[in-house]
Amino acid sequence: MLKRDMNIADYDAELFAAIQEETARQEEHIELIASENYTSPRVMEAQGSQLTNKYAEGYPGKRYYGGCEFVDKAEQLAIDRACQLFGAEYANVQPHSGSQANNAVYMALLNPGDTVLGMSLAHGGHLTHGSPVNFSGKLYNIIPYGIDETGQIDYEEMEALALEHKPKMIIGGFSAYSQVVDWKRMREIADKVGAYFFVDMAHVAGLIAAGVYPNPVPHAHVVTTTTHKTLAGPRGGLILSNDGEALYKKLNSAVFPGGQGGPLMHVIAAKAVAFKEAMEPEFKVYQACVVENAKAMVGEFLERGYKIVSGSTENHLFLVDLIDKGITGKEADAALGAANITVNKNSVPNDPRSPFVTSGIRIGTPSITRRGFTVEDTKQLAGWICDVLDNTDKPEVIEATKAKVLEICKRLPVYA
């Protein structure tokens, strides 16, 4: 018999210490990694529920195991809420991650060796959009498109490449692009060559749910997303479509049994919670503030003489190009980390350095906005970051900045 008062602290001191240390790090560091966010205690409650005990291969009403009548309810709630949130007719909430969701789309729509047009990783795309080190780059013939000299997606190049190579699928979406994507234009390009149009909206799903960024669902054959990042739910994936039953069946089969076995029912329940939270009025206010804060930070960086890729942001993230400053992304990452400010080094367009060093950093505002940073707080933070980047060789500047960070983190805790 299992006792309900069993806990990690009494049983596994080493693991408990690691968890406590990470909890403290999150509270005492300013999180600016664009793909990270803080999920609610309600989401974590669902993830820690007894639904983790249940195997449920298949889909609601069509399971391979008995005893699934209650997890069916949980999964159907997640499906219905996802459809309502994004204006979709179909949703699959079972992918364990965004990459798994993307893999399912490839499996459903393509054969190995088919040609795919995807955004270059060096210009802001994602590993699963055709990187040579990823399954997508190994199994398919990838033709990369990129951005122009202004930092905007080069739609003319994209169309020319599509007409030349006749891809079977065109991918829209990004991991490091700060502007608004013209989903309609991309669909028109896909239609010209008879290609599927697939959108990976993982980075901006929360903004889209709140109506502060254009929704690709009306334009794409299929859309995927993660359920964390700006959506602020549990780590997982989601597939959406409005393109008809024939495609829905292919997508379902590509997830199970094509790529996964049993779904994670506790995570699916947490997704249902997150989708409900994303329908609340305060979520819309939050997402609008995410964009306002990102714009405010960009303004401060520009005033301090820093180069921003594309010169502005229209979403939750932006890239700081450090080539002219004579410091690497790796050095900037380390210096800011010493001041309790967490960013990630990131390649910039035409970066002369390797992906392990880079010439830029990527900054995102979902996490700081979640903990209550205002525009004024965010401007102040941008100034602190510039102070550190201007003085990476001066420990006293880094220590002074760290003291300011600890003070504001105490004033604005993640979990009050």
UniProtKB/Swiss-Prot annotation:
Stretch forming the signal peptide: none
A GO CC term attached to the entry: cytosol
Parts of the chain that traverse the membrane: none
Presence of keyword Transferase: yes
Reactions this protein catalyses: (6R)-5,10-methylene-5,6,7,8-tetrahydrofolate + glycine + H2O = (6S)-5,6,7,8-tetrahydrofolate + L-serine
Top-rank taxon: Bacteria
InterPro entries: PyrdxlP-dep_Trfase (IPR015424), PyrdxlP-dep_Trfase_major (IPR015421), PyrdxlP-dep_Trfase_small (IPR015422), Ser_HO-MeTrfase (IPR001085), Ser_HO-MeTrfase-like (IPR049943), Ser_HO-MeTrfase_PLP_BS (IPR019798), SHMT-like_dom (IPR039429)
GO molecular function: glycine hydroxymethyltransferase activity; pyridoxal phosphate binding
Any Gene Ontology biological process: tetrahydrofolate interconversion
Protein's cellular compartments: Cytoplasm
Residue(s) at site: Plays an important role in substrate specificity: 228
Alphabetic keyword roster: Amino-acid biosynthesis, Cytoplasm, One-carbon metabolism, Pyridoxal phosphate, Transferase
Cofactor(s) listed in the protein's UniProt record: pyridoxal 5'-phosphate
CDD domains, per database record: SHMT
Family: Belongs to the SHMT family.
PANTHER family cross-referenced by the UniProt entry: SERINE HYDROXYMETHYLTRANSFERASE (PTHR11680:SF50)
NCBIfam families reported for this sequence: PRK00011.1
Subunit structure: Homodimer.
Physiological role: Catalyzes the reversible interconversion of serine and glycine with tetrahydrofolate (THF) serving as the one-carbon carrier. This reaction serves as the major source of one-carbon groups required for the biosynthesis of purines, thymidylate, methionine, and other important biomolecules. Also exhibits THF-independent aldolase activity toward beta-hydroxyamino acids, producing glycine and aldehydes, via a retro-aldol mechanism.
Protein name: Serine hydroxymethyltransferase 1
